[in-house]
């Protein structure tokens, strides 16, 4: 009797954990859906829910940084980009967005430092490398 109870209890908790895991995957997908529909308030809600359950999902942090940029919240954008780069220092898109943010804020030294890293790791966004270098030089003058 006690063995049966433990068995059913363990099955119950396993099923509950499995459902919770599946729901967590849906948070990111829902966030993407709303982001693509330009419903940034809903997207932000789902990306934040996702990082509660999956604290190392750099993609959620990256999308939250994009939402912060749209909302003109540079401090929050910077925080999210820093988190992405802690999780994955070679994330090209985060490096690119960080450089643009540094240029916008007038911090050309940080923009140059990030641009050096970006130049070494770029694979998909390399076409933007020359544009960034020109922006840093032009804006610095």
Residue ranges and their predicted role:
Residues 112-141:
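Terminal, low-structured helical/coil segments at or just beyond the last alpha-helical repeat
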Residues 49-50, 83-84, 117-118:
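Canonical positions in the second alpha-helix
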Residues 63, 97, 131-135:
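Canonical tetratricopeptide repeat
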Residues 36-37, 70-71, 104-105, 135-141:
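Register position in tetratricopeptide repeats
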């Amino acid at each position: 009797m006690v063995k049966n109870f433990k068995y059913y209890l363990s099955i119950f908790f396993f099923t509950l954990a499995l459902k919770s895991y599946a729901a967590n995957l849906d948070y990111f997908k829902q966030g993407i859906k709303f982001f693509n529909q330009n419903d940034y308030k809903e997207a932000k809600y789902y990306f934040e829910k996702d990082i509660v359950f999956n604290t190392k999902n750099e993609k959620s942090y990256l999308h939250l940084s994009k939402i912060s940029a749209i909302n003109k919240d540079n401090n929050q954008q910077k925080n999210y980009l820093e988190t992405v780069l802690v999780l994955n220092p070679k994330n090209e898109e985060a490096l690119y967005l960080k450089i643009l943010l540094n240029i916008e804020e007038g911090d050309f030294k940080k923009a140059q430092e990030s641009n050096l890293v970006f130049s070494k790791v770029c694979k998909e966004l390399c076409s933007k490398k020359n544009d960034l270098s020109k922006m840093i030089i032009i804006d610095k003058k």
